[in-house]
């Protein structure tokens, strides 16, 4: 009787399989990290483009209407929200995407960033404190309404006039939105040195972490969401950094950019 030698099937041992899986994990991680970074960069680029389009739309609105629009409220479905007198109901709210025709929007009518968070918008509500501006005809520049969001107020007051009462020698049109590099001093930032101290509008995205609670993000991000006239724009930092986590993307409109656009459209002389 002939006995056949059993055939030995060669295969991976458990140890060898474990080693292969570990190596595969390292390779996969090395591939995913650049992919994640590329996606984040693409999202930021898309959001910056949305913010720039929003800024251009605001300038176009001012060219057509002689003023800036009010922010949208949480209940206005993306429509600018003035009260019956024409004054804005809020200073900071959501970008009025329905009024300005900006895309993309969500189901509530809010313009959104690449992370589907609503774009925020603030506008100066400053009103010339002196009432009558020197040299203006009776009935002009005396309305007790915000200068930059009220019909014809920018044109009525004009860009060349100065306050007739203290503070003297400052423009009668004097927007008050400010942007700082942060609340915490760093090698890159001295908080007292403002990036701009007279913006007419600020538009910003709350970034990838925009859906988190205030307790989960940095102080500068919390301050932006609660701001009326002072906002923060700086280099992005991770959680645990000296200045705190920050990934907001912020743009603004200088009054001189607004004036130039309105002059070109014949809305300002």
Predicted regions and their residues:
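N-terminal pilin/flagellin-like segments and related low-complexity appendage regions
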Residues: 37-269
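N-terminal secretory signal peptides that target proteins for export/translocation
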Residues: 1-8
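N-terminal single-pass transmembrane signal-anchor helix
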Residues: 8-39
């Amino acid at each position: 009787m002939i006995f056949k030698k059993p055939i030995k099937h060669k295969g991976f041992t458990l140890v060898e399989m474990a080693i292969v899986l570990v190596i595969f994990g390292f390779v996969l991680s090395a591939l995913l990290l650049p992919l994640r970074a590329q996606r984040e960069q693409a999202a930021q680029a898309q959001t910056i483009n949305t913010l720039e389009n929003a800024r251009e739309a605001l300038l176009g609105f001012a060219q057509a209407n002689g003023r800036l629009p009010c922010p949208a409220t949480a209940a206005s479905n993306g429509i600018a929200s003035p009260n019956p007198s024409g004054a804005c109901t809020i200073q900071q709210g959501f970008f009025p995407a329905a009024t300005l025709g900006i895309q993309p929007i969500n189901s509530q009518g809010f313009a959104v960033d690449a992370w589907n968070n609503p774009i925020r918008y603030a506008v100066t509500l400053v009103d010339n404190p002196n009432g009558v501006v020197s040299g203006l005809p009776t009935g002009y520049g005396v309305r007790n309404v915000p200068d930059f969001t009220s019909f014809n107020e920018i044109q009525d007051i004009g860009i060349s006039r100065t306050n007739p009462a203290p503070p003297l020698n400052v423009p009668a049109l004097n927007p008050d939105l400010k942007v700082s590099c942060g609340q915490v001093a760093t090698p890159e930032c001295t908080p007292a040195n403002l990036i701009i101290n007279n913006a007419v509008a600020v538009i910003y995205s709350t970034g990838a972490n925009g859906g988190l609670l205030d307790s989960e993000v940095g102080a500068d991000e919390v301050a932006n969401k609660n701001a009326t006239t002072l906002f923060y724009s700086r280099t992005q930092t991770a959680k645990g950094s000296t200045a705190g986590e920050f990934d907001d993307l912020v743009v603004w409109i200088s009054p001189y950019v607004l004036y130039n656009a309105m002059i070109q459209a014949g809305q300002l002389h």
